[in-house]
Design a protein with these regions (language model features):
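Hydrophobic alpha-helical transmembrane segments
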Residues: 161-177
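Peri-catalytic and regulatory segments of divalent metal-dependent proteins
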Residues: 3-158, 186-191, 203-248, 256-262, ...
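Divalent-metal (often Zn2+) His-rich catalytic cores of metallo-beta-lactamase-fold enzymes
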Residues: 251
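His/Cys-centered metal/cofactor-coordination and adjacent catalytic loops
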Residues: 180
Length: 407
């Protein structure tokens, strides 16, 4: 039985090395500080958090050791990167980018199980302890959020890794880059040796099978994570994973499998895909925006707002007759989907598109409809920022009508 086998292993491990309660307490304080910083990029969606928490709770294998007092929990953060890591205090961090990259619950469960395996096997605390032997505690924790590799590590301990991680800022969005940088996660014990990755994956396969998930989700998930980084032409300096080479080694050990996909998962995470598309658009990453929205469209899960975001991205990337006509068709599709609940954003985007296409007369007609809808919205007694926005849009629309009349 996996439970008894693991329990015996951990008994021998902790009997030999001890629980290091004081070190764990200090690590917990550092983790809480790090999590406090991650709150800046927290993803707020109770439904998605509950969904991921449900998978995590089902896989939870830490009750096998009553001496482990950590409180296990899930945090979901905003990030384009397919990140997942478990802090040594029991906090599991999952990125919206990972939820968008995967296509099935089996894959998500696999990633969670692999990270949970590191925690159960105490890899993070062991790594921190090994590193701390060579550095005074004050210096060791002084620059957790720095972007230079200043921590002294026990070189012999890492001999089974081909390369040390090269440290650099990743091409990410705003504060996310520094919060999820390689030094920040490595200093919290998450720079795993190859042997640790393999042993955690092995435990994960057993745990997944025991809990009714497909163990092939490991290889499928890792393959899609590789696909993400290949698409973005990055093969090293990858937070948490180090390099594509490291991921490929894990796939070789886990065993090749076919790509998994499940519609219930795709349906559950479609709003996350829309969110990440909007985040990428706000940061002017238009190709990534379009790629994500097309995932929802291909899965027949797109909303009217998805089509609007895609039109905005397409218009930012290109200005040809073919693209403009395609964008116009997508806006018509969005309007059809909106039905009897007018989406003001559709009207605004259609006006901009028609002006680009030199169809001023049609744009003028849409402008008049837009003003009518805005006035009706204003008449509902809105206040504050909504009223300011409405007045601003009415003013803009009237200016555009005046401009068209002078063309």
């Amino acid at each position: 039985c996996i439970r008894d086998s693991l329990k015996n292993h951990l008994y021998e491990y902790f009997n030999d090395r001890g629980y290091k309660h004081k070190l764990r307490q200090e690590i917990d304080e550092e983790c809480l500080d790090y999590l406090d910083k991650l709150n800046e990029i927290a993803y707020q969606d109770d439904y998605i958090t509950s969904y991921v928490q449900g998978i995590f709770s089902k896989l939870n294998a830490t009750t096998i050791d009553s001496n482990r007092g950590e409180s296990l929990n899930i945090r979901i953060i905003q990030s384009s990167e397919p990140d997942a890591f478990m802090l040594p205090n029991g906090s599991m961090v999952i990125s919206t980018g990972l939820l968008c990259t995967l296509d099935s619950e089996d894959e998500l469960a696999a990633v969670i199980a692999c990270e949970l395996g590191h925690f159960v096997l105490d890899h993070q605390v062991n790594n921190i302890y090994r590193a701390e032997r060579r550095a005074k505690r004050a210096a060791f924790w002084a620059d957790v959020f720095a972007t230079t590799a200043s921590a002294a590590l026990d070189v012999a301990y890492w001999d089974d890794n081909e390369d040390a991680y090269a440290v650099s800022l990743v091409a990410d969005i705003g504060a996310i880059a520094s919060l999820l940088s390689i030094p920040a996660t490595d200093r919290l014990g998450m720079k795993y040796k190859t042997s640790q990755e393999i042993s955690s994956d092995r435990l994960a396969r057993q745990l997944l099978a025991f809990k009714g998930y497909n163990p092939d989700g490991i290889a499928s998930a890792l393959g899609k994570i590789i696909g993400y980084y290949n698409l973005h032409q990055r093969n090293k300096d990858i937070p948490r994973y180090g390099s594509i080479g490291n991921l490929q080694k894990r796939i070789e050990k886990a065993g090749e499998s076919h790509s998994l996909s499940a519609r219930p998962y795709l349906r559950t995470t479609s709003d996350v895909v829309s969110f990440n598309a909007s985040m990428n658009y706000a940061n002017k990453r238009y190709k990534e925006t379009a790629r994500l929205i097309r995932k929802n469209i291909d899965n027949r899960l797109a909303t009217d707002n998805d089509y609007i975001i895609l039109v905005k991205a397409e218009m930012a990337l290109s200005n040809t007759e073919e693209v403009n006509n395609r964008c116009l068709a997508m806006l018509d599709k969005a309007q059809e989907m909106a039905g009897t609940s007018p989406n003001l954003d559709i009207y605004k985007q259609k006006i901009l598109l028609l002006m680009r296409m030199n169809k001023q007369a049609q744009a003028a007609d849409i402008l008049k409809e837009y003003i009518t809808l805005l006035s009706a919205y204003e008449g509902q007694g809105i206040e504050g920022t909504e009223k300011e926005w409405t007045n601003k849009e009415i003013g803009w629309a009237n200016q555009m009508l005046d401009r068209i009349s002078r063309i």
